Amino acid sequence: MTRVLHILDHSLPLHSGYTFRTRAILKSSQSAGIEVCGITGNRHLAQGPPVETVDGLTFHRTATRLSSPPIIREWQEIEALRAGIERVAKEWRPDIIHAHSPALCGMAGLRAAHRLGMPFVYEIRAFWEDAAVGNGTGSEGSIKYRLTRALENRVVAKADAVFTICNGLRDDLVSRGHDGNKIVLSPNGVDLTLFGHPPARDETLAASIGIGSGPVIGFIGSFYDYEGLDDLI
């Protein structure tokens, strides 16, 4: 049976779009007969044991706490996670290392995979440097922005295969000169079985708030420019 070790920024029991997508990927893999295990980096800040099982999924933690200056701290994060990956891999014996963005996880997974002689795949859910610009925590063209992009370019170039969450990310990577033949689309999806049987439309409520009889699109999420809500509207 194939075993895949997933390298993650954070995971369940924390709740975020990131952790819910991770859960869906791991659960679908299990349904396909693939054994899965995860390890999180230093940015998983929830309190818990070194090894934690949540919803039938096992996650190893990287407990190192760092206080070095920027850039040095990020490299220490990579090395701490790399060491954790190698430790788990030597015990659990995975067949593939699958790292999920950000690039810090990608570089840690890449370095560990090369040292262990294992196949390495990288999944990009967003360009985190652009997300930082969108939410106001970063600026385009800054040193941090350029270093983050350079690091991710390195990971993408060296990965055996790359997954992106949408065609826009794939097209961007190809425009940078990366091989499009190794970049595969892995979009978000919805497992309708998790929702049971939805209740019938409440016509009284719809009328009271002026919705009318047409279709209704609801959005639950963050209100950042990069979400594309203006396009939806």
Question: Would you name each region that the model predicts?
Answer:
Residues 1-64:
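N-terminal subdomain of nucleotide-sugar transferases
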Residues 3-7, 211-227, 233:
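Conserved donor-binding/catalytic core segment of Leloir-type glycosyltransferases
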Residues 57-83, 136-143:
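A short, charged, and often flexible helix/loop element on the N-terminal side
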Residues 77-81, 119-121, 129-154:
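Nucleotide-sugar donor phosphate/pyrophosphate-binding loop at the beta->alpha transition
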Residues 97-118, 122-131:
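An aromatic- and histidine-rich active-site surface loop
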Residues 157-166:
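A short beta-strand/loop micro-motif in the catalytic core of glycosyltransferases
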Residues 168, 189:
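Carbohydrate-associated surface elements
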Residues 196-211:
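A short helix/loop element that forms part of the nucleotide-sugar donor recognition site in Leloir-type
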